A protein has these predicted regions:
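Alpha-amylase-like alpha-glycosidases and glucanotransferases acting on alpha-linked glucans and related
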Residues: 144-160
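A cross-kingdom feature strongest in bacterial/archaeal respiratory oxidoreductases
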Residues: 9-10, 17-148, 183-303
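Gly/Ser/Thr-rich helix-start
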Residues: 2-4, 13, 236
Length: 303
């Protein structure tokens, strides 16, 4: 992970209210599949309006996860820890009973789908390209060809599904995909007036923001601590976390930062049976698994 130091807002579809009003860390979805019922705030369970600095009380899940929509993501298996455990969980159909996956390739995650739908590539749809955390630009992805072999974007097939259950108007709000693109961009321009008109941006394909002031971490807290306290119980920088000390996780997450031996690490008794440890890495020629099978890039940057 990395901290966000972007100085501009980025576009995105509006998010609907979650009627269940529970959220969990993405890396703990496997626990929620296996033993979700009863998971609580110490497992990272929050209401949808709470953040990492909130102090929730008596927040629990009342059910295990039984169905997963895995769209444009390889997080089910490939981009997750302990994939052997994850695969074992997914093979047990008494746990997660139905998985919907939309993807371009038969990824490690797609192999576990009960319903596998072919997605469209970046060459077959229009989209707005956003930077990851740091770079100050927006790009426009212009469609090169129409989707092949009756493939549909996620928006299209979810719209068709919504229509069959009489929720099309609530889902689309009267806009098709291209109208949503324009609406989202124009809405962003009300807060980022530096951006050009939508049609100009679409034609040029990229816009780089003018260089401006970059955020300084905790600037407000340092300059005006009275009105901008730190998000801690004391409102100050804490070397000892009283919040962690009061939790049942204090041995695994100590209130004073210190080294905690990881499971299956060099101190684990398992090393007597398995003395070798494999650490994987990947080079700059791929992003996660994207381009891992690109032979031309492998020649340029062997791994």
């Amino acid at each position: 992970g990395a901290g966000d130091c972007s100085t501009h807002e980025l576009p995105g579809f509006p998010v609907l209210d979650n009627p269940y009003n529970r959220a969990l860390p993405v890396f703990l979805w496997t626990d929620a599949v296996d033993h979700g019922k009863g998971m609580n705030e110490y497992d990272g369970i929050r209401t949808c309006d709470q953040g990492i600095f909130d102090d929730p009380k008596d927040i629990t899940l009342n059910s295990n996860i039984k169905m997963i929509f895995n769209l444009a993501s390889n997080t089910l298996v490939n981009q997750h820890g302990d994939i052997n455990r994850t695969a074992k969980l997914l093979k047990d159909t008494s746990k997660c009973e139905f998985i919907v996956c939309s993807d371009l390739f038969m990824t490690a995650s797609a192999k576990f789908a009960d319903l596998l739908l072919p997605g469209v590539s970046m060459f077959e749809e229009e989209n707005i390209t956003k930077p990851w955390k740091f770079t100050e630009f927006l790009g426009f992805n212009n469609k090169v060809i129409e989707p092949l072999y009756e493939c549909k974007t996620e928006y299209e097939w979810i719209r068709e599904l919504a229509k069959r259950i009489d929720l099309e108007e609530e889902f689309t709000e009267g806009r098709d995909y291209s109208q949503w693109m324009r609406y989202i961009y124009d809405d962003l321009r009300t807060r980022e007036p530096e951006l050009p008109e939508y049609d100009e941006f679409r034609e040029k394909g990229i816009y780089k923001f003018e260089e401006g002031h970059y955020p300084i971490s905790f600037e407000k807290e340092v300059k005006d601590p009275e009105h901008h306290p730190f998000p801690t119980p004391s409102g100050k920088i804490e070397l000892f976390s009283t919040k962690l000390w009061k939790t049942p996780m204090k041995d695994f997450m100590p209130p004073i930062p210190r080294y905690v031996a990881p499971p299956e690490g060099p101190e684990d008794p398992l090393t007597k049976r398995f003395p070798l440890q494999l650490s994987g890495w990947h080079s700059k020629c791929r992003t996660h698994t994207v381009h891992d099978n690109n032979l031309n890039l492998r020649k340029l940057d062997p791994q």
